[in-house]
């Protein structure tokens, strides 16, 4: 009874089937509610997934969080990708197209690092791949050794990159059980 009186008083509109999502109320239009739902989806895909931890931290030094995620939302919206599945490799292309259309070597290295940290993969997507000597890490003989233009120091979710005089090679290995 209390809920019903609140619904009427505040003019809540919600979907009639589970999960009973809010559509609008007297202070939030349906359009604003949909925008928030899409913004949350983009935030989950890029930030909460931790797939772009280093690139996002780098960008947050230059632009505010709302601008960052709004730009990703605009890209997804303009390409018909909202609330639709996207391949993992495609996320990295979208991120690069949105923020690094002509990536610097630092931006390219950050995206490579993000990909290698987030994916248990033995290859980079085409947009991040560079000529590699085809070597693998001696310890497991399958983890690729990837060329970078920077010396990299990781501290939590922050990556400190320092321009290297020569190409530096790194292998990002994941624990077997997690």
What positions do the PLM features span?
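Catalytic cores of nucleotide-enabled group-transfer and carboxylate-activating enzymes in metabolic
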Residues: 7-9, 14-20
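Polar, glycine-rich mid-to-C-terminal structural blocks
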Residues: 22, 30-33
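Radical SAM enzyme core and accessory elements
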Residues: 33, 38-178
């Amino acid at each position: 009874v209390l809920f019903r009186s609140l619904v009427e008083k505040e003019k809540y509109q919600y979907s009639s089937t589970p999960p009973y999502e809010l559509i609008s109320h007297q202070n939030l239009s349906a359009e604003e509610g949909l925008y928030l739902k899409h913004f949350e989806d983009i935030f989950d895909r890029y930030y909460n997934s931790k797939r772009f931890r280093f690139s996002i931290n780098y960008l947050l030094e230059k632009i505010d969080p709302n601008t960052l995620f709004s730009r990703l939302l605009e890209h997804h919206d303009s390409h018909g990708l909202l609330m639709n599945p996207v391949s993992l490799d495609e996320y990295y292309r979208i991120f690069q197209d949105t923020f690094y259309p002509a990536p610097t070597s630092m931006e390219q290295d950050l995206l490579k690092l993000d990909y290698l940290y987030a994916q248990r993969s033995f290859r980079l997507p085409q947009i991040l791949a560079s000529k590699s000597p085809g070597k693998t890490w001696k310890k497991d003989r399958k983890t690729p050794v990837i060329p970078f233009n920077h010396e990299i120091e990781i501290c939590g979710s922050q990556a400190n990159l320092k321009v290297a005089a020569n190409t530096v090679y790194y292998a990002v290995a994941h624990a077997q059980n997690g």
